[in-house]
């Protein structure tokens, strides 16, 4: 029995490379949809590279696309994303690209065209404007930042 919350929202997508798959969620409950590499590349240890995915999307205003690493490749190979998560704004219409980095200290990572390289999550966001004030309201935490709540 399905309810409206289980039905995914639709996002317009433009396939820029007809040979590549569209993003896909492997399981119905998966938050992220796999993105595929539009090119074959080798990433040397400690290096980064911008890789296209062969798609462009039109996100609704009030949503954002967040690009996350794939956990298996991060664990097994050290493949990650430099600006995790990558941000796709609702008004961006260009090709989605992923800034990949090889965090392994010794082994190059080979990515073949059509391989899964990242996950795209689409989330609702609160759109805000900013209002300058002289002072901020007091809180229990105050200005205490990094490490201020302890290590355990």
From Swiss-Prot:
GO terms for molecular function: dUTP diphosphatase activity; magnesium ion binding. It comes from the Bacteria. Pfam families: dUTPase. It catalyses: dUTP + H2O = dUMP + diphosphate + H(+). GO terms for biological process: dUMP biosynthetic process; dUTP catabolic process. Pathway: Pyrimidine metabolism; dUMP biosynthesis; dUMP from dCTP (dUTP route): step 2/2. Keywords: Hydrolase, Magnesium, Metal-binding, Nucleotide metabolism. Belongs to the dUTPase family. This is Deoxyuridine 5'-triphosphate nucleotidohydrolase.
């Amino acid at each position: 029995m399905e309810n409206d919350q289980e039905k995914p929202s639709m996002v317009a997508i433009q396939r820029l490379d007809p040979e590549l798959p569209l993003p896909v969620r492997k399981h119905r409950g998966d938050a992220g949809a796999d993105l595929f590499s539009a090119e074959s590349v080798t990433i040397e240890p400690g290096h980064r590279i911008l890789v296209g995915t062969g798609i462009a999307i039109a996100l609704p205003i009030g949503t954002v696309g967040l690009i996350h690493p794939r956990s298996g490749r991060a664990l097994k190979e050290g493949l990650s994303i430099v600006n995790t998560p990558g941000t796709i704004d609702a008004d961006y219409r260009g090709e989605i690209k992923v800034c990949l980095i090889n965090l392994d200290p010794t082994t190059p990572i080979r990515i073949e065209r059509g391989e899964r390289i990242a996950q795209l999550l689409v989330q609702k966001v609160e759109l805000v404007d900013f209002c300058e004030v002289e002072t901020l309201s007091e809180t229990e935490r105050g200005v205490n930042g990094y490490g201020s709540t302890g290590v355990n």
